[in-house]
């Protein structure tokens, strides 16, 4: 969950190639914001730019692609594919009970096929990072690069550790309990916005929260967000209960960038080190003076890191 949207190593012996090769021809049908029918859903997608394809998986759940608005600047170098997960944002056609990792990843794979890309890079933020990890494990042949932004390989970091970390940081017992309920989906849909506002105004997601920072992030696109509280509740109560891929990280074959704000309370540095250590071809980069949304707080540094990573030599299919 982002502050913005709450409010409004290569493998040895493997041939390498530049990421700029084998870019599909643009047919005009892909570009712009529209609904794309794939499988049993219509996914809202916004495709911009030209170059090697980069799929962005947003967090939440309950949010949409607007939470990743700062990444629009990468369109000068890449074809950037924003989309809303099923049951999130402006995507339509499926009940919230269908929001499983099997369906979420199959949707992304069907989207790749619909857009005509052989492979692509995938960036997942927060919950989107969970989906990206599952995608890397289920569809390795479709993935050239993996960027994991402020995420973890198991749900205990948000559902159990995050409240405990806030308590150690001196937050009130009421706020700690609110965060515990929040990440475990222990609330009704009508409570979503009031709870989100309390959490946002407490500044837990940001390194240096201020009204100016909130206003600046809203101007970047957060006010466009369409909230879907039921998705967040379903994830907390069902989808993420006991979820972990930590015992399967060694299966990930794609070069991986693990990146996060050094002050993130949801997926703190120890989580990032654990994630990077378990992933064979991963590099770790912590962003100073940033919390859960470093792409909003330290935009230039994050964009430079992603550009550098995606432009490096990479294993070929």
Please give the residue ranges for each predicted region.
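Conserved HGGG/HGGXW glycine-rich cap/lid loop of the alpha/beta-hydrolase fold
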Residues: 41-93
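Active-site loop/oxyanion-hole signature of alpha/beta-hydrolase fold enzymes
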Residues: 82, 87-127, 304
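Conserved hydrolase catalytic core segment
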Residues: 118-162
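Flexible "cap/lid" loop of the alpha/beta hydrolase fold
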Residues: 146-185
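Alpha/beta-hydrolase
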Residues: 177-247, 254
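Short beta-strand/loop motif that positions the catalytic acidic residue
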Residues: 252, 258-260
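Conserved alpha/beta-hydrolase "acid-adjacent" motif
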Residues: 265-271
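Catalytic active-site module of serine/aspartate enzymes centered on a nucleophile-bearing elbow/loop
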Residues: 282-317
């Amino acid at each position: 969950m982002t502050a913005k949207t709450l409010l409004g190593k290569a493998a040895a012996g493997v041939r390498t190639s530049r990421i700029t090769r084998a870019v599909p021809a643009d047919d005009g049908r892909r570009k712009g914001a529209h609904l794309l029918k794939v499988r049993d859903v219509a996914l809202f997608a916004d495709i911009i730019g030209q170059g090697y394809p980069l799929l962005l998986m947003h967090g939440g759940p309950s949010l949409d692609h607007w939470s990743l608005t700062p990444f629009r600047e990468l369109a000068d170098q890449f074809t950037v594919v924003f989309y809303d997960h099923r049951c999130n944002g402006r995507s339509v056609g499926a009940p919230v009970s269908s929001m499983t990792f099997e369906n979420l990843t199959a949707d992304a794979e069907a989207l790749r096929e619909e857009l005509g890309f052989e492979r692509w890079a995938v960036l997942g933020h927060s919950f989107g990072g969970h989906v990206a990890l599952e995608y890397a494990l289920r569809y390795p042949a479709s993935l050239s690069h993996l960027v994991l932004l402020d995420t973890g390989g198991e749900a205990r970091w948000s559902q159990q550790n995050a409240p405990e970390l806030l308590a150690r940081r001196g937050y009130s017992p009421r706020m700690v309990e609110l965060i515990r309920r929040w990440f475990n989906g222990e609330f009704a849909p009508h409570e979503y916005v009031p709870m989100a506002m309390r959490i946002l105004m407490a500044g837990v997601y940001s390194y240096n929260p201020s009204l100016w920072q909130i206003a600046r992030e809203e101007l970047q696109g957060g006010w466009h967000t369409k909230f879907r509280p039921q998705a967040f509740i379903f994830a907390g109560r069902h989808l993420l209960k006991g979820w972990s891929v930590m015992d399967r990280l060694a299966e990930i074959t794609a070069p991986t960038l693990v990146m996060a704000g050094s002050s993130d309370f949801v997926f703190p540095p120890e989580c990032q080190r654990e994630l990077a250590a378990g992933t064979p071809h991963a590099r770790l980069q912590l962003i100073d003076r940033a919390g859960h949304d470093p792409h909003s707080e330290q935009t230039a540094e994050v964009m430079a890191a992603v550009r550098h990573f995606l432009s490096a030599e990479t294993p070929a299919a």
